[in-house]
Amino acid sequence: MQHRRPTLSPIVMALLALCLLCCACAKSAPAAAPAPSAPADSVQESPAPVQVSPAPVPSPSPSPQPTPFSFVWMTDTQALSYHVPDALDSMGDWISAKIETENIIGVFHTGDIVDNGFKSWEWDNFDLALQKFRGKIPFYPVAGNHDIGVRAQNYEGYTHCDFLNDFPPERKFGDGAVFYDLFSAGGTDFIVLGVGFDATRQFEGAFDWIDAVLQAHRDRVGIVLFHRYMDGKGETFKKSRENQERIVAANPNVRLVLCGHSSGVSTRYESYDDDGDGTAERRVCAMMFNLKGSASYGFLRLLRFDPLSRSIEIVTYSPYRDCYHVNRKTGESLDFTVEKGF
């Protein structure tokens, strides 16, 4: 009897083939690497902290230095207003041109602006200078004896001058025969007081008004403008002694006095004991300036204020002659410095 081999059905064979294929794939796949384990006694360290430097503290900015400033001082221009208008024209041009470079903040005039205050054409001549800087910087004029008429001695003509309208009514007495103004420069507060020729004699109550003004502004450095105060030798005129006693001596804030009228130049330092302790603690610098003669046409003074040293440099110059003034006999310059002048 012939035996036949048993045969697998097609279905069984297919299942066997599938099983063999799956086993082969499982053997060929790489095993996943086990996660490394830390030793039992190890301690995981925290990340080192990031060092943050503190922001630098900015250095304080240095305090700004106070700025020097200047005033122009004109005086006794009567001869120029009478017959040398070209000199006034050059003075006005120079002042206007130097406003920025010299930091000019005002123009003083200590009187005798014209030769005869009742002649309008002389005021027109002075306008050649005035209109070059008026409206740009303040103009501080006081009347001289020529401005009110040498014989008439009447303020009526002078007080009608238009430039006095630059002062508000409350800052004028006698329609402008006396005035004051306030300004600040170089870190210092100032008051400028203008007292016209014999105004304290002609206008009743002038001394009381002046005293009230200076007392109300006692914390400001006082600059006083007179026409007549002292002569070329530095001596007080007899008729000016009351002004000296009741204005300059009586008010501790007055530090500078400017005047004209007499001939030449002079400087005097006055000392006052304001607190009555027997020691003079206040010094006032008084200056007279009035150069005469054709060789001196057009001279003015530039006053340079230094806020750090508190000094005032005095420069004497003529834009008309384009020269600085020197003593013709000695060759000595008229320029000097007032130490601790304000």
Name each model feature, range by range.
Residues R301-F342:
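A short C-terminal boundary segment appended to hydrolase-like catalytic domains
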Residues L21-A24:
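C-terminal motif of bacterial Sec signal peptides marking the signal peptidase cleavage site
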Residues S96-G106, G135, D189-D274:
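His/acidic metal-ligating clusters that form di-metal
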Residues L80-Y82, D115-F118, A143-A152, G176-F179, ...:
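Active-site environment of divalent metal-dependent phosphoester hydrolases
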Residues A26-S28:
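Bacterial signal peptide processing site
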Residues P68-Q78, T188-D198, I223-H227, R283-L291, ...:
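Active-site-proximal beta-strand elements of phosphoester/diester hydrolases
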Residues A38-S42, A48-W121:
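N-terminal active-site segment of His-dependent metallophosphoesterases
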Residues K119-D208, T267-F289, L300-R304, L334-E339:
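Extended active-site neighborhood of metal-dependent phosphoesterases/phosphodiesterases
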